[in-house]
Each structure stands twice: as C-alpha cells, then as structure tokens.
Amino acid sequence: MLPNTGKLAGCTVFITGASRGIGKAIALKAAKDGANIVIAAKTAQAHPKLPGTIYTAAEEIKAAGGKALPCIVDVRDEEQISSAVEKAVEKFGGIDILVNNASAISLTNTLETPTKKVDLMMNVNTRGTYLTSKACIPYLKKSKVAHILNLSPPLNLNPLWFKQHCAYTIAKYGMSMCVLGMAEEFKGEIAVNALWPRTAIHTAAMDMLGGSGVESQCRKVDIMADAAYCIFKKPKSFTGNFIIDENILKEEGIKNFDVYAITPGHPLLPDFFLDEQPAMVTKKADSYGAVPELKEEKTQPPPKARSGAVEETFRIVKDSLSDDIVKATQAVYQFELSGEDGGTWFLDLKSKGGNIGYGEPSDQADVVMSMSTDDFVKMFSGKLKPTMAFMSGKLKIKGNMALAIKLEKLMNQMNSKL
C-alpha cells in the first residue's frame, strides 16, 4: 500500500459522507499525516444495519493522528452545508481540500424508478456536489494546495451505461460535469478532479447491491484512499482529470494490487462506466465463466445450453426448496428466457413448500428476469454472477431489486448440485 509522506499535515479536508466506507477511508489516510478532517455526514445516531456515525469516525480520526470536526450534514440541505463550512473555517482557519463522496444509488430502469428515488439521486449526487463545492470554493481559493475531488466516473457516453439505470447515470454524470466545468472555471486556483475505481469496492452499498458473498469480488476501500492521497499531493495544475484508482497507483510505483483485495487471487467485479478492463480482470473473470461488461467476444461464442438444461435446472431447484427458504424469501419470480428451451417460467417462493412451472405464475410476479437460457443455466450453476450479468446487460430485471438480490442466495445453494 502507499505510504504516507506527511504532505497533508495541517491541511483541512472537508469530506461528505465520511462516517463510513470510502469517505472514512480517505479521512483516515489524511489523518495519518496530521490533517484536520471535517466529517460532513448525516449519521449522528447508530444505524441498525450500517456501522459508524460521525462521532465514531471522529474518534478513529483522532486515534490515527488527525483532528476531527463532526458535522451533521445532509447535502440536500444548503443551510446544513453552509453551517458546516462556517464551523470548519472557524475551527481550523480555512479549507484546503474538498471531497464530494456522498452519493445515492438505485440500479433500476426508467419505468421502475420511483420519482422519489430520482429526486434523491439528483439532489444528493449532482445538486449536493454542486452546492457543497460552491460553499467551499471561496475558502479553497485562499489555499495554496486547493483540491476538489469528486468520486464520480469518466464521462462515458456509451448507451450501455444509460439503458439499465438511466436516472443513476445522469446523477453520477452530473458530479462528473461539475469537474469538467469547475476545473476550467477555477484553473490556476483550484485543482478539480474525479476519482473512480477500476473494480467494485467493498462497502455497505455494494453488500446491498451484490448480496451475500460479493465481498470476495471486491477490493478494500484502502485503494481509493491511497489513490485520493496521490491526487492531493499533486499541484493545482493537475486539474480536469478523470482518474482511475489503479492507474494512478501504478504511476506511483504500486505493483502488488493483491494487498487491496478482500480475497487475494479471486476474480474481481469490474465497476460501472468503464468500457475496457485490464487483462488481469478479464483473465480472472473468464476463468470463472464471467464476462466483463464490454469485453469484445472475438473468440468462439459460448456453448448453447444442453437440451433440457433449463428443465433440469428447475428440477434441481424444486428438489432443494424448503419451507425455510420460502419463509426467508417470500417472493414470486418470473423468468423470460430466450434461445433453446426458452419461454416463460416461474419460481414461486411464497406458497407453502414453494413451486415452479412453465408459463406465468398464478399470482403477479414480484420480480421479472429476462436473459438467455445459456446465461440462466450459468447463473444457477455459479459460472456467472448475477451482479456481473446485470452490469453487463445480460440480465434485465423489473420489479423489486431487494427481492432479486435474495434470489442470489438460493443460486449459491444450487452451485454444488448443478
């Protein structure tokens, strides 16, 4: 991992969403230099399912060698942002670095995204980033080491990244467009850049999206903290860049990336918005039967599902059903399968003992999954991760995403039997 150099000693770093995850990791990295950290986040009281508050984060920052100012901030609230900025300036004398980390996510298509979720993502991601930057900029302009760092992706206009989750993409790209505009607007005064991970990072959000076992396909938050630290060390002239964590660390001489892996040697899940995957990710993903999202398939096409493979898969699923599984799941799934042995199938995990069958379910499905028969068999046999299938466009989901994630647990139980 990247060693600290003391470069940020005495600097004041304002970080949104710093009570946990990547935001807290960046805070702790800076704290090791003796930086002043403003923890601008909503969590003042412990969440029943998520670890950490602004106050527990403050204690960790102090233990790491930094000074901490916990501030209750919902980035949708302009008054809370302004108040936190004023407190930071009063306590530490100014602001040197701003990290716009707070973000909201919903990986749902247009018709399945409630207006409330659209507003949340737009107001947290785009508007929150813009307003926090606006509030900090007058003080950043006075700093000799001024940086704004948005945790947002490169502006990739490939339609793939819009069709599955249009609202989320627009909201994240709004953060990236702040980089594009502000880097030019404040050139010479403030370095404005974006940072994005090459692979999935293990956070509470990733656990929610990927379900049980996804952590083995992720890297630790430390890789993003180290990459951010590299950026903070650069001069103001380093601006307007869309940086990938792995790339900048390679430039710093880091060669062993297994130290960042949750499970060293395990194939990693590529993150959103990146068309090209490094050879390491592609090779490891292929060895597990997965296909990165836009890998060009110049090799032989995947073999078709053997005759009756879908029926056999459902038979094994049915034999494995139990009242406990039904009780834990409580959902009806409908599968729209294309290709050989295709058609409409259902998996009823609401009725006593569970049930499967060909055709539409008698009750309305909670989740409708559309994919090829080949990918269906691969998913239930563990050769294709549902998260990877969804990200690559191989799997389309309509309905309740939380219930869709529950199905992955059942798939994991099938792996040893298929």
From Swiss-Prot:
Give residue numbers for the modification (N6-succinyllysine).
K318
Top enzyme class, one word, equals oxidoreductase
Q: Give me the Gene Ontology terms describing cellular component.
A: mitochondrion; peroxisome
Domain SCP2: residue ranges: 306-415
Mainly resides where? Answer: other
Q: Its GO biological process terms? A: cholesterol homeostasis
Which InterPro entries does the protein's record reference? HSDL2 (IPR051935), NAD(P)-bd_dom_sf (IPR036291), SCP2_sterol-bd_dom (IPR003033), SCP2_sterol-bd_dom_sf (IPR036527), SDR_fam (IPR002347)
Q: Which residues bind NADP(+)?
A: G17, A18, S19, R20, G21, I22, G23, K42, D74, K172
Swiss-Prot/TrEMBL keywords: Acetylation, Hydroxylation, Mitochondrion, NADP, Oxidoreductase, Peroxisome
- Spell out which residues are annotated as carrying N6-acetyllysine: K116
Q: Pfam families from the xrefs?
A: adh_short, SCP2
Q: Where is the active site?
A: Y168 (proton acceptor)
Modification type N6-(2-hydroxyisobutyryl)lysine: residues: K42
Name the EC number(s). 1.-.-.-
- Record localization: Peroxisome; Mitochondrion
NADP as a keyword?
yes
**MF terms (GO), sorted A to Z:** oxidoreductase activity
Entry superkingdom: Eukaryota
SUPFAM superfamilies recorded for this chain? NAD(P)-binding Rossmann-fold domains (SSF51735), SCP-like (SSF55718)
Q: Which family does it belong to?
A: Belongs to the short-chain dehydrogenases/reductases (SDR) family.
Q: What does this protein do?
A: Has apparently no steroid dehydrogenase activity. Controls bile acid (BA) and lipid metabolism in response to nutritional cues.
Designated name of the protein: Hydroxysteroid dehydrogenase-like protein 2
- In its UniProt entry, the species of origin is given as Bos taurus
